[in-house]
């Protein structure tokens, strides 16, 4: 269901997820978000996100949700207490498969930048069993199935 699976990320009722090495950022005079590789940053030498800055990020983990399991992404409480905001659009439908989660993140601090780096624990997934299988799964009708990396909005589809 989650690849790579790391038992050290398992909590009593959730699974921690980690930040991948690619983000999409806003740049002046360009309406589309631009790809930024943060793969060379580390915890000791992080990428700094300025106050109020919004970006999309991917998880390292790839998800292969069965037809009877959904999941919800939430920030780790430590990250929220540091000042991170999440747009709460992290619902993963049953049958969402072969995809990395794209997270909508923002530095909610007023005066101080916040650090990110690949591999940092950013959030956790809460998994939910569904009672009935859907007639048509997300693998057949979803806009974001099979996304192997961070993905901008496909809301126009």
Regions found by a protein language model. Name each.
Residues 1-157:
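DUTPase catalytic domain/fold
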């Amino acid at each position: 269901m989650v690849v790579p699976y790391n038992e050290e990320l398992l909590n009593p009722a959730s699974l921690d997820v980690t930040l991948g090495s690619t983000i999409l950022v806003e740049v002046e005079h360009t309406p589309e978000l631009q790809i930024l590789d943060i793969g060379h940053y580390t915890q000791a030498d992080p990428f700094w996100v300025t106050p109020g800055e919004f970006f999309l990020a991917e998880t390292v983990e790839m998800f292969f949700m069965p037809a009877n399991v959904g999941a919800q992404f939430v920030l780790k409480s430590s990250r929220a207490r540091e000042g991170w905001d999440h747009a709460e659009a992290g619902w993963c439908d049953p049958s969402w498969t072969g995809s990395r989660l794209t997270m909508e993140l923002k530095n909610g601090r007023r005066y101080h930048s916040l650090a990110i780096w690949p591999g940092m624990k950013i959030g956790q997934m809460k998994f939910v069993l569904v009672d009935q299988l859907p007639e048509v799964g997300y693998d057949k009708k979803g806009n974001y199935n099979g996304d192997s990396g961070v993905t901008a909005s496909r809301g126009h589809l």
